[in-house]
């Protein structure tokens, strides 16, 4: 149904300010030197390395297939979902509009603020009042792995903070959907 575009490292905003991703945070915890290398790429001091890792390519494709199967499942159950096109410039605004409209699920939600950016796999509407109405949203990250890693928790926590800025209330839960189950944190 949809092919994911990867925005994994920091970038510059139109105002020449560096915007970080959840991956940058996780990478920095594991290797501060990688942060410096990525910074040099953003500043134009180094070329972005080209990755030809076929194993990672296969895993990425399997992940996309898993997300697509979840979308098909949602559609078969009659849920109203909204897909954000990652190639659109106004993905953040479309995400906020979908939240205000009360879509049951939002796929590839563009979440960003002045310092952080990312694409949440899914947002799910829940029965918790917010400035959106009688509902609010929580993040769902899809993972093929049966174990949740620290980087995943950092990612969904960061996305939850950005969601709170939009809806005026911090999500009660964060979720990770695996092929076997949905884990709620």
Regions found by a protein language model. Give the residues of each.
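Metal-dependent nuclease catalytic cores that hydrolyze phosphodiester bonds in DNA/RNA
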Residues: 7-132
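Nucleic-acid nuclease catalytic cores
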Residues: 111-185
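Short, intrinsically disordered, charge-balanced linker/junction segments flanking boundaries
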Residues: 2-5, 183-185
């Amino acid at each position: 149904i949809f092919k994911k575009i990867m925005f994994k490292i920091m970038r510059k905003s139109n105002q020449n300010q560096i915007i970080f991703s959840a991956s940058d945070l996780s990478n920095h915890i594991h290797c501060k030197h990688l942060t410096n290398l990525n910074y040099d790429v953003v500043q134009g001091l180094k070329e972005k390395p080209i990755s030809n890792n076929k194993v990672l390519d296969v895993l990425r494709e399997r992940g996309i297939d898993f997300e697509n199967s979840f979308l098909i499942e949602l559609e078969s159950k009659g849920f109203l979902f909204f897909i954000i096109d990652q190639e659109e410039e106004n993905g953040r605004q479309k995400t906020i509009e979908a939240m205000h409209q009360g879509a049951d699920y939002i796929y590839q939600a563009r979440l960003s603020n002045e310092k952080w950016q990312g694409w949440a796999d899914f947002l799910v509407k829940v029965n918790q009042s917010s400035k959106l109405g009688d509902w609010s949203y929580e993040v769902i990250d899809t993972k093929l792995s049966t174990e949740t890693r620290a980087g995943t928790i950092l990612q969904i926590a960061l996305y939850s903070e950005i969601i709170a800025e939009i809806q005026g209330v911090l999500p009660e839960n964060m979720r990770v959907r695996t092929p076997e189950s949905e884990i709620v944190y």
